[in-house]
Amino acid sequence: TGYEEAAAQGLMAGINAALKVKNKKQFILDRSTSYIGVMIDDLISKGVSEPYRMFTSRAEYRLTLRADNADQRLTCLGIDLDLIKDERKNSFLEKKKNILSVKTMLDKNNLTPNEAKKHNIKIAMDGVKRSCMEVIGQRNVNMAKIRQIFSNIPDRGKSIDNQVEIDAHYMGYLQRQSKDISSFKKDELVIIPETIKYETLSGLSNEVKSKLKKVKPRTLGQAIRIDGV
């Protein structure tokens, strides 16, 4: 709608104003962590001529930035910033513990292709053992089916099962995307000094120097994402 721009910037401004008063480190959400991070980075590195509208297509790591895992990505950060009330904090920590307990047992239990076939689960007949977490990632396999085979997998409720199943479906894609995120974070760790004089750097066109001076990127990664750089 465009209202996301004002709301998100207001939230981040409020958080960082409070941190500055307390002489604490600035809080930054990056592109791999949240859509707020994507938006702020776009506003800085690309600029806008109209209200910014948040589309999933703007995020290169959108498989990680899903609605179903927003609490897992961001609530811990909110707890660290003392933004989360105790009731919600305790509820989140309990959910996190339950998800971990289920995933741990799924990783410990394995199925060979022949064993899976006996239970009408279709996986590649390649002789490779797969963890139950991997098997759930297959189409038409859910937690109820796996519990019929392995009784030691805890039942923490439907909502936990749903989250585990979603995570399992995305697992293979996320493992590949994590390599891209690692590369992204590596560039984000290279801080550009605020005192840098771009006009003295050789090998850069006047246009690029002008854009860098205007945007004042904080990191190498941010500089790379400026249009035309």
Place the predicted regions along the sequence by residue:
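Mid-to-C-terminal Rossmann-like scaffold of FAD/NAD(P)H-dependent oxidoreductases
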Residues: 23-77, 81-86, 90
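Short FAD-binding loop at a beta-strand-to-alpha-helix junction that anchors the flavin cofactor
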Residues: 1-2
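Internal hydrophobic alpha-helix adjacent to the cofactor/substrate pocket in enzyme cavities
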Residues: 6-27
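Extended, charge-enriched "interface" segments that sit outside catalytic cores
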Residues: 58, 70, 75-80, 84-229
